[in-house]
């Protein structure tokens, strides 16, 4: 059991944002496995306030790409998960935003578990969330864009070349103990 614990901790710590992809398909079963993990995210009162669009269609990817500085990432990814908060399922905004964050983290971890795939959570597109809703003909009264996760086969040459270790704040910088 102890070794599983350490493996899980190491697994979480080795997840990285991947912004460079090579051309390659992702099977429907793999996509469904990732979505299955996502749906197990915790949510207050188990309201599961998420709605997700799986975008592989080139025209839709291009329309999304036009709305963000991250256009090359959206276009080069095999698929983009476009995640919305379902406002009709919402009961407490803060708790629902936390649930969406957990949902999106589960996607990132599930993609990381495949080892050959990578993903990045894109938030800059939120500046154009109404236009994203228009692409999908979704009411802004019912759905609010929370983010896009681009997923594809990692371009190992770029990932290894960049190889930088991202700095993380030390625990002392943000942890206070009350004992």
Residue ranges and their predicted role:
Residues 1-179:
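Acidic, surface-exposed loops and disordered segments
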């Amino acid at each position: 059991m102890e070794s599983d614990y350490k493996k899980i901790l190491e697994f979480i710590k080795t997840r990285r944002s991947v912004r460079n992809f090579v051309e390659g398909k992702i099977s429907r079963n793999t996509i469904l496995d990732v979505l299955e993990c996502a749906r197990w995210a915790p949510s207050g009162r188990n309201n599961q306030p998420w709605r997700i669009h799986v975008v592989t269609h080139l025209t839709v990817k291009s329309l999304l790409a036009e709305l963000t500085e991250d256009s090359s990432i959206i276009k080069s990814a095999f698929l983009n998960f476009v995640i919305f908060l379902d406002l009709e399922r919402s009961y407490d905004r803060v708790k629902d935003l936390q649930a969406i964050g957990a949902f999106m983290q589960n996607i990132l971890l599930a993609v990381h578990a495949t080892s050959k795939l990578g993903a990045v959570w894109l938030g800059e597109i939120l500046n154009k969330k109404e236009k994203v809703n228009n692409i999908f003909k979704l009411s802004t009264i019912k759905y609010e864009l929370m983010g896009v996760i681009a997923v594809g086969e990692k371009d190992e040459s770029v990932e290894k070349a960049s190889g930088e270790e991202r700095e993380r704040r030390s625990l002392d910088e943000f942890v206070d103990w009350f004992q």
